[in-house]
């Protein structure tokens, strides 16, 4: 029973399923915030990945934590264009010149590829944080030397706590991250096509 929540007033039952990825994103942002030596609002932030978790991390960072210096990267132009409709950030391809070595205070890796991890450790500033959320690849090379010598904090995050989920329901019901009009509804018979597009 402790994991069953009533949908609050202000949150449409069609929007309620977004609570799960929002709670994952909130949990990651809160853990990232705890790891920093300055407020999130003062950080230059990279969000790797423009899927649901990446977009939601960006919305929480921007609309709740006051972070106005966000770069979101994704190789899929359709995702970038969609995210740009709802999030105030700079949107780039992962290979863009905007993503330079030692230039971000905190990175949220919502992808979890070897390539995204390598980029994260390259672009994080000394003393910065990498919050690893994505689970695409289990292993691969990583610059532990930079992590050690430059005192970079690397934290893995998984799911959320009950407190995170309760807070998420309030955030969604109060529209604290904006309207959820970015949610798309498709017939189940078109599910395969939807996955191909992402």
Where are these regions (language model features)?
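Glycine-rich phosphate-binding loop and adjacent beta-alpha segment
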Residues: 115-174
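Redox-cofactor binding/interface segments in oxidoreductases and associated redox assembly factors
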Residues: 47, 109, 132
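Glycine-rich phosphate/adenylate-binding loop and adjacent beta-alpha elements
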Residues: 1-5
